[in-house]
Regions:
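Aromatic- and Gly/Pro-rich donor/ligand-binding loops
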Residues: 7-18, 22-174
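Charged active-site motifs of nucleotide-sugar-dependent glycosyltransferases
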Residues: 6, 228-233, 257-258
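Structural alpha-helical scaffold elements that stabilize or flank donor/cofactor-binding regions
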Residues: 116, 175, 251, 290-291
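Catalytic donor nucleotide-activated moiety binding site of glycosyltransferases and closely related
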Residues: 156-160, 237, 244-282
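A donor-sugar binding/catalytic signature common to diverse glycosyltransferases
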Residues: 291-330
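A nucleotide-sugar donor-handling region in carbohydrate enzymes
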Residues: 101-122, 131-132, 137-138, 156-231, ...
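Short beta-strand scaffold positions
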Residues: 125, 184, 299-300
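Donor nucleotide-activated moiety binding/catalytic core segment of transferases
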Residues: 203-211, 215, 264-301
């Protein structure tokens, strides 16, 4: 019997965002359904390594660090309640990763990353916002560690933005031109790649990995649990728009339903603790799915809030997320 193809996966399994973890799970599940062995690669960069060989001037280096710091800063300024929620979400995410994601390979430093790259038949990246501006300057997301002869694949990878700054064009073009199969999650991502690389580059637009599993397959993987006896609506708003939350409250009152709020760990608004009948802190991805399954409808500004409402055939109301230091496409 021939050996199964070995596929390295570049995902976001350690993020506290529900969508990031659930699409990591779905991607691994889908790839393995094709008869492949998978390994999720987690890269722990060694700060003493000087291994970025291309386009690594002082300005790109500074911008890359600045972008990274902004991601970390989204959690600064949380009050005591929201900080507690954030820490509980981190713990729940760790439990989910250990329970549902398998074959995780931690690479400490660039040399271990190179060794990992040599052990695969292909390396696949996707989905979420992996292609933020500046990632091509590094070694991991750019797949610079992947040797010739190992296929580079992106599945529905999101850029998270509609345009790149000009300083990113050359490195990003070199990164994308090396892919054997290139796809993104949004039409704007396809347009961005063609703008950077030229109109002749082949880019597909594919569905988010969470859609690769059917409602029944999600049920088989994460069994349904009844979260509340009374009828309710779920409010899952990552942003901090007060009027959106009050809109959900008015709807629930009009329909005579309880309103359940899955508390955001990325923003704070003055009504967070008093607009809902039930505030859920520290919910993990399993709880996220099950609260949606049992709801009459969902109010959300989240891509994956929308996705799991569609998968579970739920009525929903989708808001545009006002920028509050976080992305608007998750």
């Amino acid at each position: 019997m021939a050996n199964k193809p070995r596929i390295g996966l570049i995902l976001v399994p350690e993020h506290t965002n529900y969508g990031a973890q659930l699409q990591s799970f779905a991607t691994q599940k889908a790839v393995e359904s094709f008869g492949c062995d998978t390994e999720i690669i987690i890269y722990k960069a060694n700060k003493s390594n000087r291994n970025v060989k291309f386009y690594w001037g002082l300005i790109p280096w500074f911008i890359k660090r600045l972008l990274a710091s902004k991601v970390q800063d989204r959690y600064k300024g949380l009050d005591e309640v929201h900080e507690k929620n954030h820490q509980m979400r981190k713990a729940a995410s760790k439990v989910f990763k250990e329970k549902y994601l398998k074959n995780i390979r931690i690479c400490n430093g660039y040399n271990e990353l190179v060794q990992a790259g040599q052990s695969y038949n292909a390396v696949l990246i996707g989905s979420d916002q992996m292609w933020q501006p500046g990632v091509a300057f590094g070694n991991f997301i750019s797949m610079r560690f992947v040797p010739d002869g190992v296929r580079r694949i992106s599945y529905a990878t999101s850029c998270g933005v509609s345009k790149y700054p000009k300083y990113c064009y050359k490195s990003s073009k070199d990164m994308w031109m090396r892919f054997d199969f290139l796809s993104t999650r949004e039409e704007q991502g396809k347009a961005l790649i063609k703008d950077v690389c030229g109109k002749n580059i082949k880019v597909e637009v594919l569905a988010d990995p969470t859609y690769l599993l059917s409602k029944q397959e999600w049920e088989d993987c994460i069994p349904t649990q009844k979260m509340l006896k009374e009828p309710y609506v779920v409010c899952y708003l990552i942003g901090n728009d007060v009027e959106q939350k009050l809109c959900a409250k008015r709807y629930a009152q009009h329909k005579g339903l309880k309103i359940v709020s899955l508390m955001s760990n990325e923003s704070v608004s003055p009504v967070d603790m008093n607009f809902a009948d039930i505030n859920i802190m520290g919910a993990g991805p399993e709880d996220f799915i099950n609260w949606i399954r049992g709801a009459d409808c969902l109010f959300t500004d989240s891509f994956h809030g929308l996705a799991f409402s569609v998968i579970n055939e739920k009525q929903l109301y989708v808001f545009y997320r006002h920028k509050s230091g976080v992305s608007v496409t998750k």
